[in-house]
Structure formats: structure tokens, C-alpha cells
Swiss-Prot record:
Organism: Neosartorya fischeri (strain ATCC 1020 / DSM 3700 / CBS 544.65 / FGSC A1164 / JCM 1740 / NRRL 181 / WB 181)
Cell compartment(s), UniProt: Cytoplasm
Catalyses which reaction(s): L-kynurenine + H2O = anthranilate + L-alanine + H(+); 3-hydroxy-L-kynurenine + H2O = 3-hydroxyanthranilate + L-alanine + H(+)
A Gene Ontology BP annotation from the UniProt entry: 'de novo' NAD biosynthetic process from L-tryptophan
Protein name: Kynureninase 2
UniProt cofactor(s): pyridoxal 5'-phosphate
One cellular component (GO) term of this entry: cytoplasm
Keyword annotations from UniProtKB, A to Z: Cytoplasm, Hydrolase, Pyridine nucleotide biosynthesis, Pyridoxal phosphate
Modified sites of kind N6-(pyridoxal phosphate)lysine: 274
Length: 464
């Protein structure tokens, strides 16, 4: 079983390489209307060095960088203005007063509004999700709770090319416990000359290190290659060998279907500014499975028993939050991991972005995404051979083993020239040293015609 089950790879007719065919896919797209819910940066604006209002020109850019930062939903301004008006008009009363004509709950309950919407995206119960902090900060909090090394079980299994912030976080927790990172951090990578890490290799690492490993922490989707890991299979197997299992879902959140509760994942964390469109540095989210979030009062109301974590007043139950008696009683579930009063301004941006997802489902978005990425792959490979191409797609070809992103490894010396040429053509995508262009058509706002146009520009840039 794969993360998304068995996915059939879309097949395309003989005329699929034409612009007319791309336009026909757009015309038949049931989600096409969602594009109107976003502000697409214009070609003129992305070339400007001064602040400009949206729509400086009528010609939008082609924005394939949602795997780095999503574009702004039109709802964001409305939600922010509502929050600012609440603050300016009633001040501190905004914590408890529900404004009838605002799309937002009172500040005291606003994080729960966001968590409820996020829970549908990650496949969890609302009380298993908390809207809080940022990704690395949340990983620190979760590691403090779940990484409990012993004299015999202290290793952490992780991705060989983890995003640097994840690596730093794990390394710091290892050092915090006075352990040697070189001996404690076990890096799982692909075989020499390849980029995909087979599931069986991960399982073999679990077998090899199970007696000494305390935890495995992997990315749901590897940020560099775009590989989607088999979350349920890896989680189940690691549990069978006695490991705690955590996932960094930075590139999986709002990109692929997730069922964190059903898959019995112990903990997970994600950012919301990529496919989630909540804005640069937006408030993040975390998941704690219900089995770890329970609060036991069997020994009395003043002696709650719960999983150890770093605590703060906002993780305290609302019934005691303002009593100021220094008797911590955590909110059951992920909410009990909250530390401080969250920014109502940040939550407004997050709730605005989530309001778009509330109008559809991850199943529908994933269905379109699989077709878009397959079409991109088809056009990139058409009329080429391994020998003639000046790039290699290092993302798995199996739709069940990838999300929206394709990572193109260019031949040496081409990256900066190609990236410059694409930007001149009004195309925004992500480059990663030493030679990868990451292309991510996002089903909420990108089109099949844009995919066709991108491929024409890329091939022209490679031929220069």
C-alpha cells in the first residue's frame, strides 16, 4: 500500500503536445474557478523593484513556485481587515467578543478555528491538530516530548538530505542529551548514482538499528527530489520494531492526501506557506495522535497525568487558563502543546487561506494534481531521449510516489542561465544548488496551458 493507494498514471493522446489540447484540459477542469480566488503576480510586478498594487499589468506571470511560497488568496485582505477593525474598535475585548459580521472567531477560539480546517487537510481529528508556532519550533517542542533516549535506545533515523533546519533541530536535541551526533543520527540515503530511496531500504535500516533506535523522523515529501514516502507502511513497520514515528510534512501538507490518525502516526509538523498559501513565515501546525494527547485525572483534579512536554499557559485548559494558580492542566490533544498566546494577525492569514480549502477536498485537489504533474512530465520527455535531454527528472515517475513537484537536474553549468531565462519570460520556479529546478504546478491556481507554455520556454532556454 502506498500513501495514496495505487494511482494509475494518466495517458495522453497523440495531440497532447499542442496548446489546443492544454486549453481543452483547462476547459474541462472542474476546479478551474479556484484560480479566481487568488492574486496572480503580474509579469510587470515581478520585474519591479518598487512596491506595486496587484494588477500593475493585466498579464499574469506563470507561478510554479507554490512548493516554496504559495500566492496570496483574495480572502487574505478581507480577513486581515476584519482582524484590524476588531482590534481598533474593541481592543482587548476581541479576545472574547464574537463579531457577527467577521469571518473570524473571537481571538480566544481562533486557533481552534484554524486547527479544525487543518485537520481535514491532514486526515486527523480536530483535537489532534494545533495551529501554532513555526515548523522548526514545533519540531523542537515535539522532539522534547517524544525523543526519550535511553542507555540502549538513543538513535534517530532520518533523511540523508533533510532540510537543514530539521538537521539542526535534531542535532541540537542529540547534543542536549549529551550524545554524539555522529553516532546517534543515522542518515538514510539512496543508492549511489540514484535519487529515490526505496521503501524497502528504509525498512531495512529500521531492522538494522531497531535495538538501538528511539525514533524515526522523515519528510513526508523530500524537498529536493520531490519523492513522496510511503507514510503508512513505514509508520506501521517502525512501530512493529518499537520506534516512535514522526513526520515533517512541509511539502506534503495541502499537496497530497494524508490520513495521519488512521495511519497511527505519533507526531507530525508542517508549515502552511507553501501549498497552504498562508503567507511568508505563516503560523504552522502540528499533529499529536490522540493516544499521546490524553489527560488522566484518575488521581484527582489537581494531579493530571499526561505525556511530558515543554509547557506554557496557552496549552492549559480554558477552565483554568486565567486562574493564575500555577496548576497546569493541559488541554487534551494537540492543543495541550501550545505555549503562548498566538498572533491573531497571523491566524487571520491562516484562516483566510484555509477558507479556500474548506470549499473543496484534498481528494479533488490531488486528482487534478496527479494529472497536471503527469502532463508536465509528458511534455518534458516528449520527442527526447536520455542521451539528448539536458536534464534528468530525479522525482519518481510513479504518481503515488510524488506530489505536485518535479525536480529537474540540469547538466552542469546550465542552472543560472536557465533560471534567468525563465524569469525573463515571466516564469517563477525554484532553483536549488547545484543544478536543480523545482517545478510545482498547483491545482488551486495553475493551469494546463501554463504547463504547456513553461515547457516551451524551458526547451528554448536549454537550446540557447
Amino acid at each position: 500500500m502506498s500513501t495514496n493507494g495505487t494511482l494509475s498514471k494518466p495517458e495522453f493522446p497523440a495531440n497532447a503536445a499542442s496548446k489546443e489540447y492544454a486549453a481543452s484540459l483547462d476547459a474541462a477542469d472542474p476546479l478551474a474557478g479556484f484560480r479566481e480566488k487568488f492574486i496572480i503576480p503580474s509579469k510587470a510586478n515581478i520585474a519591479s523593484t518598487k512596491l506595486a498594487k496587484p494588477g500593475l499589468s493585466s498579464e499574469p506571470c506563470i507561478y510554479f513556485c507554490g512548493n516554496s511560497l504559495g500566492i496570496q488568496p483574495k480572502a487574505t485582505q478581507k480577513y486581515l481587515e476584519a482582524q484590524l477593525d476588531t482590534w481598533s474598535s474593541i481592543g482587548v475585548c476581541g479576545h472574547f467578543t464574537k463579531i457577527e459580521d467577521s469571518p473570524l472567531k473571537e481571538w480566544q477560539n481562533l486557533a481552534e478555528q484554524a486547527a479544525e480546517s487543518m485537520s481535514k487537510i491532514v486526515g486527523a481529528a480536530p483535537d489532534e491538530v494545533a495551529a501554532m508556532g513555526t515548523l522548526t519550533m514545533n519540531l523542537h517542542l515535539l522532539l522534547a516530548s517524544f525523543y526519550k533516549p535511553t542507555a540502549t535506545k538513543r538513535k534517530i533515523l532520518m533523511d540523508w538530505k533533510a532540510f537543514p533546519s530539521d538537521h539542526y533541530a535534531i542535532e541540537s536535541h542529540v547534543a542536549w542529551h549529551h550524545l554524539d551526533p555522529q553516532e546517534t543520527m543515522v542518515l538514510i540515503g539512496p543508492d549511489e548514482g540514484t535519487y529515490e530511496i526505496p521503501t524497502e531500504k528504509i525498512l531495512s535500516y529500521i531492522d538494522t538499528h531497531a535495538d538501538e533506535a528511539a525514533l524515526i523522523l522523515l519528510p513526508g515529501i523530500q524537498y529536493y527530489t520531490g519523492q513522496l514516502f510511503d507514510i503508512p507502511k513505514i509508520t506501521e513497520y517502525a512501530h512493529s520494531r518499537g520506534l516512535i514515528v514522526g513526520w515533517d510534512l512541509a511539502h506534503a501538507y495541502a499537496n497530497v492526501q494524508l490520513k495521519l490518525h488512521d495511519w497511527d502516526v505519533d507526531f507530525a509538523a508542517w508549515c502552511t506557506y507553501k501549498y497552504g498559501n498562508a503567507g511568508p513565515g505563516a503560523m504552522a501546525g502540528l499533529f499529536v495522535h490522540e493516544k499521546h494527547g490524553q489527560v488522566d485525572y484518575s488521581e484527582g483534579e489537581d494531579a493530571p497525568k499526561f505525556r511530558h512536554r515543554l509547557t506554557g499557559w496557552y496549552g492549559g485548559d480554558k477552565s483554568v487558563r486565567f486562574k493564575m494558580d500555577n496548576k497546569f492542566k493541559p488541554i487534551p490533544g494537540a492543543g495541550g502543546y501550545q505555549i503562548s498566546n498566538p498572533s491573531a494577525i497571523d491566524l487571520a492569514c491562516l484562516c483566510a487561506a484555509l477558507s479556500v480549502f474548506d470549499e473543496t477536498s484534498m481528494a479533488e485537489l490531488r486528482k487534478k494534481s496527479v494529472l497536471m504533474t503527469a502532463y508536465l512530465e509528458y511534455l518534458l520527455l516528449k520527442d527526447t531521449t536520455d542521451e539528448s535531454r539536458q536534464f534528468q527528472i530525479v522525482t519518481p515517475s510513479d504518481p503515488a510516489a510524488r506530489g505536485a513537484q518535479l525536480s529537474l537536474l540540469l547538466k552542469p553549468g546550465l542552472l543560472h542561465k536557465v533560471a534567468h531565462r525563465l524569469q525573463e519570460a515571466g516564469i517563477i520556479c525554484d532553483k536549488r544548488e547545484p543544478g536543480v529546478v523545482r517545478v510545482a504546478p498547483v491545482p488551486l491556481y495553475n493551469t494546463f496551458t501554463e504547463i504547456w507554455m513553461f515547457v516551451q520556454q524551458l526547451k528554448a532556454a536549454l537550446e540557447e
